[in-house]
Amino acid sequence: GADVTPAGLPFVPNMPTEEIFTAPRWDGVNGRVYAALPLALDGNLVRNFYLDFQNGKIVNVHAEEGEEFLRNSIQLDEGSSYLGEVALVPYNSPIRNSGILFFNTLFDENASCHLAFGSAYPTCVRGGEHMSEEKQKEAGLNQSANHVDFMVGTSDLSIVGTTHDGTEVPVFVDGNFAF
């Protein structure tokens, strides 16, 4: 998740940041995900929503409030209906512990694990920032004019990684890093 200044110095452009992020394969997400916090979307609130994914694409949307705004954002362009980011943020982060919901993604994303539908960050793939859009897509990166973060982290979130040999490794236990 780092970047490089024109002078060649590495830096993390989101300060302060609590997240470790990457890009999922644009066509590799399946299942249902529930939002843990409301989403402020272009001045409108979306509450208590979930998204269903099939082969990476959002195929079903439900929200108790603001569903039409969520649907409109997902339909902005073809890439808006695919994920571009997966970010891990411990539940006990300073932003979460403040107890404040800012309704501003740049702050709220540091309070919770989150996903984003829309564009992926090219820096998530080695050399991605120097690839053509076609090569980025081949490398698994989603492209869109949109990038909308929504929070999924909860106090009971469990994440288990699987290594190449099939070994399961706890990554998150009870909302926080397992190590």
Residues covered by each model-derived region:
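Metal/cofactor-centered catalytic core regions of large enzymes
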Residues: 1-179
